[in-house]
Amino acid sequence: MEEKKSKVILHGTWISTYSKRVEIALKLKGVLYEYLEEDLQNKSESLIQLNPVHKKIPVLVHDGKPVAESLVILEYIDETWTNSPRFFPEDPYERAQVRFWVSYINQQVFEVMGQVMSQEGEAQAKSVEEARKRFKVLDEGLKKHFPNKNIRRNDDVGLLEITIIATLGGYKAHREAIGVDIIGPVNTPTLYNWIERLQDLSVIKEVEVPHDTLVTFIQKYRQKCLQQAANA
């Protein structure tokens, strides 16, 4: 851990994949921090003041200075605490590829995951088909651009790995809650292998949501979405 006397506070929510990204990043760097759970149905005045533009989590407060948006926060953490692991490769092309696939997950993958979770019947079947296509693209991209990736310890984790495990690490809970199988050793072997190796790391175990808790949340969230759609 790098010696740095400072006050670090993270405003987040336990279920947010964006909050999890920041938690993982802080733990990887060995940064001591205070965690404040926010109720997004009743946002605190401090959250609104710290992030007046979006009024969203996560917000990192470092020595009284707020930083918002998960990707911006992760870059800030990496530039402020320069000890290992570094979240971006030194090679410019590899760094560009990391940014590209993080963007792909944030836009293409996250979107279709939400559709699969909140739909049923024919609409869901179409979204599942689209999800499998997008996940296949991600899987092939990881295989092509990061062929020598070996995840064995915390120092092997960077921005892309953080994004993958925070966003997709709960795929087994999604499968149990929704009954849809997308990630697996046959469908997405490279992605599956990355996730399995990441889940073996101690830093990931520290922040992961218990399986049964996540299943229950997804089921309740799905029912809420379906009820809202029925009443629309």
Curated annotation (Swiss-Prot):
PROSITE patterns: GST_CTER, GST_NTER. PANTHER family: GLUTATHIONE S-TRANSFERASE U10, GLUTATHIONE S-TRANSFERASE, GST, SUPERFAMILY, GST DOMAIN CONTAINING. One of its GO terms (cellular component) is cytosol. Its EC number is 2.5.1.18. May be involved in the conjugation of reduced glutathione to a wide number of exogenous and endogenous hydrophobic electrophiles and have a detoxification role against certain herbicides. Glutathione binds at S16, T17, N42, K43, K56, I57, E69, S70. GO terms for biological process: glutathione metabolic process; toxin catabolic process. It comes from Arabidopsis thaliana (Mouse-ear cress). It is found in: Cytoplasm, Cytosol. Pfam families: GST_N. One of its GO terms (molecular function) is glutathione transferase activity. Belongs to the GST superfamily. Tau family. This is Glutathione S-transferase U10. It is an enzyme of class 2 (transferase). Keywords: Cytoplasm, Detoxification, Transferase. Residues 6-85 form the GST N-terminal domain. It catalyses: RX + glutathione = an S-substituted glutathione + a halide anion + H(+). CDD domains: GST_C_Tau, GST_N_Tau. Residues 91-226 form the GST C-terminal domain.
